[in-house]
Swiss-Prot record:
<dbReference type="InterPro" id="IPR010368">
    <property type="entry name" value="Com_YlbF"/>
</dbReference>
<dbReference type="InterPro" id="IPR023378">
    <property type="entry name" value="YheA/YmcA-like_dom_sf"/>
</dbReference>
<protein>
    <recommendedName>
        <fullName>UPF0342 protein lin2326</fullName>
    </recommendedName>
</protein>
<comment type="similarity">
    <text>Belongs to the UPF0342 family.</text>
</comment>
<dbReference type="Pfam" id="PF06133">
    <property type="entry name" value="Com_YlbF"/>
</dbReference>
Length: 117
């Protein structure tokens, strides 16, 4: 019987959204967005992350100013309980995504392991 892999993917999407980890992440994100100070700090943190990633991806050097700003913003974020909570929830969700990715990649790993035997 043929499986529509896209239907399976949509079921996985729905399942992820129903996990306690995702629901907790949504709640934590809502709490950050409802607090003006936390929201501003979190947005600044994300902007700095994107800037650093863009520089890394394009081979640009990360200058001292960017490093200093990143350190300052990271310190501010660590001092905000709402953002710390959000990051903890993100980490829990990341663990699930990594586990799912490992499961999804198993058929390819098995294929190449058999081919190499």
């Amino acid at each position: 019987m043929a499986v529509n892999i896209y239907d399976v993917a949509h079921d996985l999407d729905k399942g992820i959204r129903e996990t306690p980890e995702f629901i907790s992440l949504q709640d934590a994100y809502r709490e950050v967005n409802e607090n003006a100070d936390a929201k501003a700090k979190f947005e600044r943190f994300r902007d700095v992350q994107v800037t650093i990633q863009e520089k890394q991806m394009t081979g640009q050097e990360i200058d001292d100013e960017t490093v200093n700003v990143a350190q300052q913003v990271a310190q501010e974020v660590q001092e905000n309980e709402l953002i710390v909570k959000l990051m903890e929830k993100e980490q829990a969700m990341s663990t699930i995504i990594n586990d799912l990715n490992r499961i999804i990649m198993t058929p390819l790993q098995d294929l190449y392991n058999v081919a190499n035997d």
